């Protein structure tokens, strides 16, 4: 590691590095496993997340801009996913009557059937790859940690 000076980066300590690397590796494995477990339903994790958000929304519809924000997808990435999902018949886009440039993402009955079919397997996957490895106390601590980190990003967006 380079010598420390006023302009040198503050390198991670061994404990910090272990925590960081463990998080990165575990999260990549977790997302890959969840994605693989959805393959039997012809869904990807982003598809599932989009359908899950739409299934919870009033009338199973959200403005595209709101859906992009909720799912943390760029507008272009969401647009690409929507094209794939429209082709599969899970969603459709509808023009927003109050905003000529705006569109709604709307879940179709086929999309509803897809998420209803996939949800039990997805929950089982989340349990086996994540929840079952943590005690209730660890789940509470982890939720607190990631809520704090998530909040720091929200503050950056508001301030930025």
Predicted regions and their residues:
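N-terminal helix-turn-helix DNA-binding core of bacterial DNA-binding proteins
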Residues: 28-76, 158-160
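N-terminal leader segment of winged-helix/HTH proteins
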Residues: 1-41, 140
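Short, locally clustered residues in the helix-turn-helix/winged-helix DNA-binding domain
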Residues: 24, 52-59, 119, 147
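C-terminal regulatory/oligomerization modules of transcriptional regulators
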Residues: 1-14, 136-160
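Short, hydrophobic-biased segments on the C-terminal half of alpha helices
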Residues: 64, 82-83
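Charged, amphipathic alpha-helical coiled-coil/dimerization segments
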Residues: 5-7, 83-144
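Pre-recognition alpha-helix immediately N-terminal to the DNA-recognition helix
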Residues: 18, 22, 49-53, 113
């Amino acid at each position: 590691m380079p010598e420390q000076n006023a302009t040198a980066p503050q390198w991670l300590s061994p404990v910090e590095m272990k925590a960081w690397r463990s998080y990165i590796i575990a999260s990549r494995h977790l997302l890959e496993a969840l994605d693989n477990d959805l393959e039997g339903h012809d869904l990807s994790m982003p598809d599932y997340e989009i359908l899950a958000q739409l299934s919870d929304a009033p009338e199973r519809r959200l403005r595209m801009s709101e859906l992009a924000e909720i799912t943390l997808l760029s507008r272009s990435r969401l647009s690409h996913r929507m094209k794939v999902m429209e082709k599969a018949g899970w969603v459709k886009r509808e023009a927003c009557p109050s905003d000529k440039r705006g569109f709604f993402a709307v879940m179709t009955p086929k999309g509803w059937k897809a998420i209803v079919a996939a949800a039990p397997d997805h929950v089982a996957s989340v349990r086996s790859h994540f929840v079952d490895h943590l005690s209730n106390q660890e789940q509470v601590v982890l939720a607190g940690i990631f809520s704090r980190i998530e909040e720091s990003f929200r503050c950056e967006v508001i301030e930025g």
